[in-house]
Amino acid sequence: MQRRPEAAGDLLEEVRAHDATLRARNIELWIGAEPTFTLRQSQDPEWLVQAEGGRKLEKGIELLQALVAELGVPARFVRARGRQFPGELQPRFCLGADWVRGSSGKPVNSVSALLDGPLEAVPEPHPERAWLTVTPDPGVVEVNLPPSPDLESFLDLSEAAYRAADTAGLSPERFRFNGEGTDSGGGGQITLGGPTPQASPFFVQPWLLPAVLRYLQRHPSLSYAFAGECVGSASQGPRPDEGVRERFEELAVSLDRLEARGRAVTPEELWGSLAPLLVDASGNAHRAEVNVEKLWNPGLGPRGMAGLVEFRSLRMPRTSRRLVAIAALFRSICARLVTSPTVGPLREWGTALHEQWALPFFLEQDLRAVLDDLALHGVPLGPELSAQLFERDPPLYAGQAPGALLEVRPALEFWPLLGDVASQETLTARLVDPSTRRLEIRLTLEAGTPRGRVGVCGWEAPLELVAHEGEREVLLAAVRYRAYVPSPGLHPGLLAQEPLELVWEHRGTRTGSRMHAWKPEGGPYPDLPRDAQEAARRRRDRVVPVDGSTLPPVKPAPIGVNEHPTLDLRRLPSDG
């Protein structure tokens, strides 16, 4: 496959340096991914909530055909047996392509085989063959990429997948009517393993997986910085300390025992010790931050005994470069832990896990600490790869005054599951109450600048000093509020708390704005945003400057409402 210009430059050099570092350490760590794409402008159910229907099969065929053309391989198109989930009347489609690794040429059969060819079983994994599939999931089509032996080949494969999706009219992201950007609606999982199950680094170095689990648990940025909108216990990838307390305590015991046994740990023992504990609150092994279903799972046959570990707390990246950077990050963490597995005990985060680590500022700090640690242990990420990890949208609001900068950014919110957990096991998605939003208020002050006050809907935001950046102080607060009234949902009678009125009192002045969730003038939007530029304009239009002198005076919230430091408007009188 001929490399396109987007893979040139500093990024490619850093990717090659990364591969050279792992080769020098004799670490063989293959990479897999399952990028998901959607029809961004469509409001049809198969591109929102349903797995199949409409044009999804047609678009899946277009995507696979375009990807095989991008790769330039002599693939054989295969109509394979797809998965069938509880409650579904028939298996989902599975569009496959099979070829010999390292070969080049044109497809050996017609793409029509994907419609009228014989129905074949999915082939068993083989190190000399590549197997690529396109399958449906709710709202998206998923591309299951063949494993790559190094980051450079993963870069080529990822960029080809994104180009093919664009050719097929599919997108890795969506925009809501109000301009909010989100991912495709599917996941962006990364899988690591070896060329064969026996050569998996998780079996060759049995201490690696326990060390990875400790490392991730001690660095919440790895759980949240790249996650989707739904995080926490009801998400697709909850942390071990977000589930049942007893399981987390037992995980500490299992990790101690595995590490004490060192190289004597067998694949059976490794999987058997961890699989019952790496699950969500209902015991679902698929919904876990670190998924070991295909590590050494005899219940799934050969496909479950593959030596693979999947990292699931990852949203679909907007660009192939970001996907490659995330893969490089987790690959580097594994490489660091192969030779230096001691990272310390599991941490008791308590309420800080869903308070402090909900805020972008702390996640950025922790992620930088991870990168510093990797560099200290000889597996650094270059500046271009690192920059991809910190890519983010502009703040919702930014205001400047002499010696001061005020920014408001979206923060994470941990949406609760509705009803009995077990009763939702047959659904394609969990039913949560997503009506609560959290914002980070960040005030950066030059030396000697008075703090002033920030008010939200008449209540003072509990700004706390959290860091010094050179001569500057950084103060943070969080605000939680109900954005809309869901049905079904929690807290009947609690109305939507918007628009949010923001007032900044600084050096005797009051600057105000109203932050709307929808068009300030009301009424429907004509259609979805055409592109990222129009989406950004709609977001800007929802923040309306107002005369600060007309807004109510700021008063402190009652004791018990401001915690860690969060102002929860849902717990305050609605009249401000």
Give the residues covered by each predicted segment:
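C-terminal accessory/tail domains of diverse enzymes
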Residues: M1-S184, P195-G576
